A protein has these predicted regions:
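NAD(P)H dinucleotide-binding glycine-rich loop of Rossmann-like/cofactor-binding domains
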Residues: 16-77
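Glycine-rich phosphate-binding loop and adjacent beta-alpha segment
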Residues: 139-212, 246-247
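A short acidic, Gly/Pro-enriched loop at the edge of an enzyme's catalytic core
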Residues: 124-132
Length: 247
């Protein structure tokens, strides 16, 4: 870590995390200080690496739902990187969280993260929900819309199923909101047009340090094992995030 030439940003040698839209594999990269968060001593770099993309995505999506205190919130793809953060952040916001997963095995540990209910698919969900955070897409997205009460919302964060979604007039979209989530949308920018991710990353890191947020690393290894990590992710053998250590 080298400080900015104008003296702004963290000091030399600071441990930082950033959301980088490009240059993530470079040995050196210029980063606007607004993109950076200085990490608490209790948060190691591997753990911090899970926060900028998955953590910030979940945080921004949960915020878009407004007040969640006492409300039923559905999270699909809850065992994935974004899903696990979404479960925890919605629960921290006071929601009754229903975590949907693909198999019983992938639901392990989600109650410990704050889920009030863990279900396989959505057939077990029989009562309406105030909102849904969807990471799966495909037919499950249409089913989630059916479950959302009038004036509720579905935020589609991802489409892990890689399947099309068919929506009909029966979904009554006039009385429901369907948002396609983009992580940078709504974020303030610096005068140079850089997204101001730093404060959100810092908040997540503080929650981790306080043991209020638990990143789940399902695979971790040296960077030369990257092909192994990719294959584990593609075959859905990783719950949470995969982390490569570069030394």
């Amino acid at each position: 870590m080298r400080p900015a030439s104008d003296g702004s940003g963290p000091a030399a040698g600071a441990r930082v995390a950033a959301f980088g839209l490009g240059g993530g594999w470079a040995e050196l990269r210029a980063v606007d200080p607004a993109e950076l968060a200085v990490l608490p001593d209790a948060v190691d770099l591997g753990t911090a690496a899970t926060l900028p993309a998955a953590g910030v995505s979940a945080l921004r999506a949960v915020r878009r739902l407004g007040s969640l205190l006492g409300r039923r919130v559905l999270v699909t793809g809850a065992s994935g990187g974004v899903g696990r953060f979404a479960v925890q952040l919605a629960a921290l916001s006071g929601a009754h969280v229903i975590a949907s997963v693909g198999t019983r095995a992938r639901g392990a540990g989600l109650r410990d993260l704050g889920a009030a209910e863990v279900v396989v698919g959505l057939d077990e969900v029989t009562e309406p929900v105030h909102a849904a955070l969807d990471n799966v897409g495909g037919p499950l997205l249409a089913q989630a819309l059916d479950l959302v009460a009038e004036h509720g919302a579905v935020i589609q964060i991802g489409a892990a199923s890689n399947q099309p979604t068919t929506l009909t007039l029966a979904h009554k979209l006039v009385n429901k909101r369907l948002d396609l989530f983009v992580v940078g949308e709504g974020l303030t920018t610096t005068p140079n047009g850089v997204w101001n991710f730093g404060p959100d990353i810092a908040l997540l890191a503080e929650l981790v340090a306080a043991h209020r947020l638990t990143p789940h690393i399902g695979w971790r290894g040296p960077w030369h094992r990257a092909p192994e990590a990719v294959e584990a992710l593609r075959s859905r053998r990783v719950a949470g995030k995969a982390v490569l250590d570069i030394t």
